[in-house]
């Protein structure tokens, strides 16, 4: 009997020692990449809290060091938009008739859905013609926008995709170019209109501007962004595809957007002024 008791005690002791190991391995497995939840839509990459935080910090730092890295800007936008900000933007669409229509129909802005030859044939000063002229002048295409990956809610993922694809329309309506000075000015406007954190964080890239550019940003573009961003309607609710023939000046008035000074023209005038001063100094020497 004593032997049986000892054996029973030994087996119980072995069981008690092995049980915590099993629990620990199960807990560790729950954070394993192999145990990641299934994607909720094509291209979706589910992230846990730590992964999302690392993505937000890493992409933000990378985008600050190289503001032309559109992939890092996109990743930062997605990582910092949840849990609150993208839902606020989605709710803004749900509270607006046009926004609800966009969410139902889910249009995409590409060179196939908006052919450039058609846009170029539209009346002068129309929204579509202005958009096409801006694309031609800046040498960009609507097909370069990355697909959303890191937002878990499928409907909110579309909202972020919609914002991303409408970004060039914001450029066209305001006339702001794609070089860094223009992008920062537009991001400041977008932040006050959409409250997407990435657009606000993008303003830190102003530290990388040349002193004269940074001075212009705080003297001209930031005050304009504050005025127009706070006064304008929610741009996410604009169904751009249905107003292509509308006069762009009329649209700006309806949306409450003040047209900023022509950034390219200002830079051209400054270059010419510097050239004249240089020639004058050479002649006087």
Curated annotation (Swiss-Prot):
Binding, Zn(2+): 167-168, 171, 183
Enzyme class: lyase
Pfam family, any one: Coq4
Keyword Transit peptide: yes
GO biological process: ubiquinone biosynthetic process
InterPro entries recorded: Coq4 (IPR007715), Coq4_euk (IPR027540)
Reaction equation(s) it catalyzes: a 4-hydroxy-3-methoxy-5-(all-trans-polyprenyl)benzoate + H(+) = a 2-methoxy-6-(all-trans-polyprenyl)phenol + CO2
EC number, as in UniProt: 4.1.1.130
Co-factor requirement: Zn(2+)
Keywords: Lyase, Membrane, Metal-binding, Mitochondrion, Mitochondrion inner membrane, Transit peptide, Ubiquinone biosynthesis, Zinc
One cellular component term from this protein's GO annotations in UniProt: extrinsic component of mitochondrial inner membrane
The organelle targeting sequence, given as a residue range: 1-38
Coiled coil: none
Membrane topology of the entry: Peripheral membrane protein
Pathway: Cofactor biosynthesis; ubiquinone biosynthesis
Subcellular localization: Mitochondrion inner membrane
Keyword hit for Nuclease: no
PANTHER family associated with the record: UBIQUINONE BIOSYNTHESIS PROTEIN, UBIQUINONE BIOSYNTHESIS PROTEIN COQ4 HOMOLOG, MITOCHONDRIAL
Quaternary structure and partners: Component of a multi-subunit COQ enzyme complex, composed of at least coq3, coq4, coq5, coq6, coq7 and coq9.
Annotated family: Belongs to the COQ4 family.
Free-text function comment from the UniProt entry: Lyase that catalyzes the C1-decarboxylation of 4-hydroxy-3-methoxy-5-(all-trans-polyprenyl)benzoic acid into 2-methoxy-6-(all-trans-polyprenyl)phenol during ubiquinone biosynthesis.
Full protein name: Ubiquinone biosynthesis protein coq4, mitochondrial
UniProt organism field: Aspergillus oryzae (strain ATCC 42149 / RIB 40)
């Amino acid at each position: 009997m004593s032997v049986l008791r000892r054996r029973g005690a030994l087996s119980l002791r072995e069981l008690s020692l092995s049980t915590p190991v099993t629990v620990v391995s199960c807990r560790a497995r729950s954070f394993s990449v192999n145990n990641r939840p299934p994607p909720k839509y094509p291209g979706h990459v589910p992230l846990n809290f730590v992964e999302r935080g690392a993505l937000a910090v890493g992409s933000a730092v990378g985008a600050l060091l190289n503001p032309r890295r559109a992939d890092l800007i996109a990743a930062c936008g997605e990582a910092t938009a949840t849990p609150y900000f993208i839902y606020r933007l989605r709710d803004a669409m749900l509270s607006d008739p046009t926004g609800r229509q966009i969410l139902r129909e889910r249009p995409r802005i590409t060179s196939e859905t908006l052919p450039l030859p058609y846009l170029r044939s539209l009346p002068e000063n129309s929204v579509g013609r202005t958009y096409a002229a801006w694309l031609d002048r800046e040498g960009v295409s609507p097909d370069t926008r990355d697909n959303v990956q890191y937002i878990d809610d499928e409907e909110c993922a579309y909202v972020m995709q919609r914002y991303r694809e409408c970004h060039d329309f914001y450029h066209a309506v305001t006339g702001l170019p794609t070089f860094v000075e223009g992008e920062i000015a537009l991001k400041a406007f977008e932040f006050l209109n959409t409250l997407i954190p990435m657009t606000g964080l993008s303003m830190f890239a102003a530290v990388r501007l040349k002193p004269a550019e940074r001075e212009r940003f705080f003297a001209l573009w930031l005050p304009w962004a504050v005025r127009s961003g706070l006064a304008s309607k929610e741009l996410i609710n604009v169904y751009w595809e249905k107003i292509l023939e509308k006069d762009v000046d009329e649209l700006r008035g309806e949306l409450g957007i003040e047209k900023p000074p022509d950034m390219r023209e200002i830079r051209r005038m400054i270059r010419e002024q510097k050239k004249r001063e240089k020639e004058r100094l050479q002649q006087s020497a």
